[in-house]
C-alpha cells in the first residue's frame, strides 16, 4: 500500500492553533498552549512528505524540537514515532529503539512482528515488556545490524497506517559513533531504507539537525549523496510581522497590556537585531521581570533589560553557542573556529581572505579550503554569522555583544 496523498496533507499534521494562554518558557521545547504558531513551516513539512522525507535544520533553541513534537502530537493519518538520538553511539541502539517504539504504538503488529528473521525472543514476545524487547533486539543486532536491521524494517509493511519517524539530532548521533567506517555505513544504510520500495511505501522520515550536517558527513569520509534524497527545510528567524505578533502576545499574557506601544516593539527589535524567537523570549523575560519589580515599561527600560540579559548571572542563556563548537568539531578545529568568531566579534566585519589566512595559519596546512568553506557555511547555517558581499559579521548584535564580553 502506498502512502495516500491526503495522509501527508499539512492540515492533518497540524491543527492551526494558538493557545488562549501562552507562557514565555525560555529554553526547553514547548507544546500545547505554549507552542507559538509556525504554521508555514509545518505546512511546508506536510507538503514535502507527500513526495519525500525531510531534513529539518535549525540552530539550537529555534523551535525545531517543538515543531517536531507538535507534528507528533497532531499526526492523524500517520503512526508517529519521535526519538531524540543525540546520546546514541551505535546503529543497533538506533534500530532497537525505533522498532520497539513501533511495536509499543502498534499492537496489531505483534502477531507478525520479527517473524522468520532468527531472533530467539519471538516465542515469548507476548510476555516481554518493551524495555526487555529493546535490550534483546540490541543484543541480537550487535553482530549484523546492517542486514538484520533492514529485515526488521521490512516487517513494518503490514502496518495499517504509514509510519512517520521523527528523529531529532541525527548529526550528533553520527558524530558520536567512534568508528568512522561504521558511521559511514550507517548513513548509507539509512539512505537505503528510504530508497527500498517495500520500506519507503510505508514510511516517511523527518530528521532534525541543530548543527551543519555536511561537515559531519565529510568528517566520516563520505559525501552529501547520503542525504541528497531529503528535502531540506530550514527554520528561519521571524518575519517582521511575526515578531511583532510574538512580542505583543508574550507581553500581554505576562503583564496584560493589550495595546502595546509601537515604540516598545521597535525598541526590542532594534536591540535584538535579527528577530530570532529565542533571543526575543530572553529579552522579553528580562523586561517583564523589571516591570514586575516596579519599573515603568518604556523604551529606556529596554536598555536595562538588554544589560541584564548579558549579565554574568544570565550567561547560561547563550553559553551553548560556545560549548556546542567543542561537541561539533574536533578539538583543534573547535579552537580555530572560536578564534575566527572572536576576530569577527572584535572587528565587527572581517573579509573572507583574512579569515582564510587565520585558518591556514592555525591549521598549518592540515585541512584544505573545502573544509574552510564548509565551516563558514555551517556558521552561517547555525546563525553565528552572516555574509555581506565578501565580508562576514555576526548575525545578531546580541550574540556579538555576548561573545565579545565573555570570549572576545
Protein language model regions, located:
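The catalytic "switch" region of P-loop NTPases
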Residues: 17, 161-163, 172-271, 278, ...
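P-loop NTPase nucleotide-binding core
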Residues: 52-62, 66-180, 203, 369-370
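A short, conserved structural fragment
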Residues: 380-389
